[in-house]
Amino acid sequence: MEDKALLTEAYQLVSKLNQTIQSCKQGLPDDLRLQQNIDEILRALKKAEKVDNAILIELETFYQRTSLLIGLGTLKLNEQTRTAWRNYDKFHYDQVKHVLTLYGPVFGF
């Protein structure tokens, strides 16, 4: 996938998630954390000019934090929001995970 296309698709998917999440906010601390995660990654994607390891790490950080909030948090998501998250999840595994380069010691089990 072309650099700009990856950034554009990530931005569109996170924006869609952001739009759908607005309808099911309840004012809980997890809602605030999720909104902060979304705002951070949207800023980073808007600022990014090319795909490099820095933006891939930002995307991975967003994915890990958001996945934890959705999986174990107190968020009450509707079906539309779950679908938007699954779409981003699929994109992340198909386009980001295999491109991300890890440096330093990596321990596999």
Task: Pin down the residues of each PLM region.
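Amphipathic alpha-helical interaction modules
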Residues: 21-72
